[in-house]
Amino acid sequence: MIKKKNLLIFFAGFIFLISNFTFAQQNFLYKSNNQNTEQNNIANSILNRIGAGLSSGNVSEISGYLNTQTYLSLANGISGYYSSNQAFYVLEDFFNIYKVTSFHFQSVQTNGNLPYATGVYKYYFRGKKDSANVYISLKEVGDTWKITQITIN
């Protein structure tokens, strides 16, 4: 009789522990998903602001998001890693030569650790209309997102 009682107490305690553990996991996953959703929303907002900067050809709207080392690959043949200051002037020269007529993102991916967007940059160059594909990737730096790569080819 005592063995059955001890066994019953053991199983009741075991079930209690498992249910608490499961609740803790669900609570952790809920918090984690909310944080991911918030980070995705922030990344999406930043990509929209970068898109607005590309649409206007205004590098000042983009410069606050340039990482300490940003990879650039541009239609004028420039490619490599640049500091945020260097990237500002390289992009400013590019926008002055390749005058934007329109820009829009075709795809924005903010799920995961490395958000990115692709789009089409339409411009005038030497009196002719042309277009280039755009790829922009971000990475989380501290409590914000920074541009790690801009490709306009």
Predicted regions and their residues:
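Hydrophobic pocket/interface hotspot
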Residues: I62, T70, A87
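Sec-exported extracytoplasmic/periplasmic mature domains
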Residues: G51-S55, V59, N67, Y71, ...
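Short, low-complexity N-terminal intrinsically disordered segments enriched in polar/charged residues
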Residues: F23-A52, S56, G64
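Bacterial Sec-dependent N-terminal signal peptides
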Residues: M1-L29
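Surface-exposed, charged secondary-structure patches
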Residues: F88-R126
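A short gly/proline-enriched turn/hairpin at secondary-structure junctions
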Residues: L72-G80
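Short beta-strand edge/turn micro-motifs at domain boundaries
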Residues: Q25-N27, K129-N153
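Envelope-exposed proteins and targeting segments
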Residues: I50, T68, K99-H104, P115-G119, ...
